[in-house]
Amino acid sequence: MRIRTLLVLLGAAIAATASAETKISGELQCKSEPPTPVAIPDKPNHAFVVVKATCTWTKPFEMGGSQVKDGTETISSEISGDRASDHGYFAGAMAGGDTYTVKFGGTSHSKDGKSAGNEGTWSFSGGTGKLKGLKGGGKYKSAPAAADGTITTQVDGEYSLP
């Protein structure tokens, strides 16, 4: 009876360790291509915008034994005045060649036509190779855009692998 109880407890401990989430934190810099706005004529400064950006991790983290490297994000925003509701995807690459996809959404602000920062939540929506079955998510927060249009984003969260 004691051996069976010990085996059950050991199995539960191994299962809990295997599914435990690992904290991650990093910093990403993105530079966007010119946006594609479509005005909505119901009120001033109302539009839908699609933006594509190339991004590099300036403070990378590791997942599955490899370091995050770079990626591309595609953002769809509904702008109303100086605020926007953002939704998008980030397709990222690892130094070892595996890839991952992130879905995100949040709110951004602008001032004088330039990004004044944004924040929101994100979650992994896929992965390849060692990242197959990747799960997790977290929050992000961006600083106002630099003079050259580069946006720096702090990303924090957690992940787990099967």
Each PLM stretch: what is its role?
Residues 11-19:
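Hydrophobic h-region of N-terminal signal peptides that target proteins for export
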Residues 10-11, 43:
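Extended interaction regions within the primary functional domain
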Residues 1-7:
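Bacterial N-terminal signal peptides that target proteins for export
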Residues 20-162:
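Beta-strand-enriched cores of mature, soluble protein domains
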